[in-house]
Amino acid sequence: MILFVGFLLMEIVMPQISRTALVPYSAEQMYQLVNDVQSYPQFLPGCTGSRILESTPGQMTAAVDVSKAGISKTFTTRNQLTSNQSILMNLVDGPFKKLIGGWKFTPLSQEACRIEFHLDFEFTNKLIELAFGRVFKELAANMVQAFTVRAKEVYSAR
């Protein structure tokens, strides 16, 4: 029973966000949009800056600046890249005790795919969670929609 209660408490403390969408764009197109970290400030709500710190063909370390309602934070992730298939993110630095997640791109045809976004996170302390938690959850929950809108802007113009 204690383990079960502990598990329930752990689930409450560590929020999870999962979103899925079917889009009329290829897995390659969606992967390229999500992997284009430097373009995030142009279209991601709340993203005020982004930069690639290190990059190799299979891995990228990137920092993202987020600001909303007067609250600003920067976090850095190391992303494992599987070209046109997935991007797995792990926390390097930021206001989190834990931040892991990623994107999966599943082809449905040559011109359509399913995108999946999942994020597990826990803030370093309650004060940061109170100040930034709601803002971060809102931004993370809207990421799939933001990338879907971006895909329409970028790929429908071609």
From Swiss-Prot:
Phenotype of the disrupted gene, per the record: Deletion of the ratA-ratB operon has no effect on bacterial persistence on rich medium for this strain, but does affect bacterial persistence for E.coli strain CFT073.
GO MF terms, alphabetically ordered: ribosomal large subunit binding; ubiquinone binding
Pfam family, one: Polyketide_cyc
GO biological process per UniProt: cellular respiration; negative regulation of translational initiation
Entry superkingdom: Bacteria
Keywords: Stress response, Toxin-antitoxin system
InterPro entries in alphabetical order: COQ10-like, COQ10_START, START-like_dom_sf
Family (UniProt): Belongs to the ribosome association toxin RatA family.
Biological function: Toxic component of a type II toxin-antitoxin (TA) system. Binds to 50S ribosomal subunits, preventing them from associating with 30S subunits to form 70S ribosomes and reducing polysomes. It does not cause ribosomes to dissociate however. The antibiotic paromomycin blocks the anti-association activity of RatA. Overexpression results in inhibition of growth in liquid cultures, and in a decrease in protein translation. The other gene of this operon, ratB, is not the cognate antitoxin in this strain; in CFT073 however it does fulfill this function. Low level expression in a deletion mutant increases resistance to acidified sodium nitrate which causes nitrosative stress.
Subunit (UniProt): Associates with 50S ribosomes.
Protein name: Ribosome association toxin RatA
Organism: Escherichia coli (strain K12)
Gene it is expressed from: ratA
